[in-house]
Structure formats: structure tokens, C-alpha cells
């Protein structure tokens, strides 16, 4: 099971995401990095063994500029990147920013053109809020995606809360698909990681528990990492 640390980018700095209230995100404070400089945060992740990181460009998602220069500069680790793709134009825009081993995220929260789910070399984010998938049914999504496209179960309302993962939701999605499944939002401790591992989850996205020192990134990568 991969451990994929997260960076939320806003106004060129790393911020602490909580419950999807993006206007209220504050500069990141972390036990593993003294700076909210996203380059330094990414380096701290890599130094502790991370092979892939998740980046969300909150400015582009909110229609208020972008952080593409920062994303390009983080070229020393593989990335999966969410810019809130709505259209093919958005997808082509972010692909130009990424390296060949990076992947663009297509997320149900923002997607307008469901045909984009058929693209190769993407990651699809199943964005849930309070247990409900945003904008599409799961069957609609699964009828479009390629068999090898990873699916992120992202509980937006749980991001940054450390209130734990939704085991029933994870089981529900796993029962419906053989695609690789990632889980993000609300990881509170080792028990959540063990639960995801035992269920057969392929990767976990995590930030808050690492930055607060609840989980040691190097330790959990050594324990669960593939």
C-alpha cells in the first residue's frame, strides 16, 4: 500500500486543508518542516521515503490564478495533481506542466465532460461530501473509466479533521470495482492505515496526521509501503 503525502497549494505556499473550506485554509505548520514553502515540504516528504505526492492547486480550482511554477519546480518526486479539471482544455493545460511519470487528477467535484474519464494516464477522484458522491453516480463513473485507472475515494468533508476513514464507503467502492483504489480524507492514526491495508486499498493520501506528529511518515512508509 502506497503512502502518498499531500500538499495543498494556495498563493504559492503550502496550506492546511480542512473540510473543503478552501477560503479559510491557513499556512501549513508542521513538525517535519519549519517552512510552508511547498518545495521544502516536498523535499521533507521525499527525505522520509515518499515516492509519490499529491498536490492540489487551490488557486486554479477556485478560478483565482495558479501555482504551476511551483508544481514544475517540484520535479524531484512523482506527482498526482488536482487543478479542478472541468474540460479537455484544463486537462491539456495541466499535462503540459507535468513530467512524463506524473498524473493529472480528474475529479467528480469539478468535472463537466464525463468523456474525459476514458483518458489514459489519469487518476480519477471520487469526491464525496457527507457520504454522497458529488455530481455523478458511481455506476456512471465506473462505466467510463479504464480498468487500470486509479480511483481516489476522497471524503472532502473529512479532509484535515482526523475523524477517521469511512470503512463502509471504502468497502462499497471496493466491492464495485477491480480498479486500484486510493483513500484520502480524515486519516487519524495507525488504526486507519491498518484498516485500509486489510481491506486491500492500494494507496492512502495523508497530510494532517503527519504534520501534527501523530504518524511518523518514514515509519508508516516502511511498515505499509510497497
Curated annotation (Swiss-Prot):
Pfam families xref list: His_biosynth
GO molecular function: 1-(5-phosphoribosyl)-5-[(5-phosphoribosylamino)methylideneamino]imidazole-4-carboxamide isomerase activity
Cystines in this chain: none
GO CC, alphabetical: cytoplasm
Highest rank taxon of the organism: Archaea
Signal sequence residues: none
One example of a Gene Ontology biological process annotation: L-histidine biosynthetic process
Family according to the record: Belongs to the HisA/HisF family.
Protein name in the entry: Uncharacterized protein MJ0703
Provenance organism: Methanocaldococcus jannaschii (strain ATCC 43067 / DSM 2661 / JAL-1 / JCM 10045 / NBRC 100440) (Methanococcus jannaschii)
Amino acid at each position: 500500500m502506497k503512502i502518498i503525502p499531500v500538499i495543498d497549494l494556495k498563493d504559492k505556499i503550502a496550506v492546511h486543508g480542512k473540510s473543503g473550506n478552501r477560503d479559510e485554509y491557513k499556512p501549513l505548520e508542521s513538525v517535519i518542516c519549519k517552512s510552508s514553502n511547498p518545495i521544502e515540504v516536498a523535499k521533507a516528504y521525499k527525505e522520509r521515503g515518499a515516492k509519490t505526492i499529491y498536490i492540489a492547486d487551490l488557486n486554479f480550482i477556485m478560478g483565482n490564478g495558479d501555482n504551476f511554477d511551483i508544481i514544475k519546480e517540484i520535479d524531484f518526486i512523482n506527482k498526482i495533481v488536482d487543478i479542478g479539471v472541468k474540460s479537455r482544455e484544463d486537462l491539456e493545460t495541466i499535462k503540459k506542466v507535468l513530467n512524463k511519470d506524473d498524473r493529472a487528477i480528474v475529479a467528480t467535484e469539478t468535472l463537466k465532460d464525463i468523456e474525459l474519464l476514458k483518458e489514459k494516464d489519469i487518476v480519477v477522484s471520487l469526491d464525496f461530501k457527507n457520504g454522497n458522491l458529488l455530481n455523478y453516480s458511481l455506476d456512471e463513473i465506473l462505466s467510463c473509466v479504464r480498468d487500470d485507472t486509479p480511483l481516489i475515494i476522497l471524503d472532502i468533508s473529512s479532509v484535515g479533521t482526523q475523524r477517521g476513514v469511512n470503512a463502509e464507503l471504502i468497502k462499497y467502492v471496493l466491492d464495485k470495482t477491480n480498479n486500484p483504489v486510493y483513500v484520502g480524507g480524515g486519516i487519524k492514526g495507525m488504526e486507519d492505515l491498518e484498516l485500509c491495508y486489510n481491506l486491500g486499498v492500494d494507496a492512502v493520501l495523508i497530510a494532517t496526521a503527519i504534520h501534527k506528529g501523530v504518524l511518523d511518515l518514514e515509519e508508516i512508509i516502511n511498515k505499509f509501503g510497497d
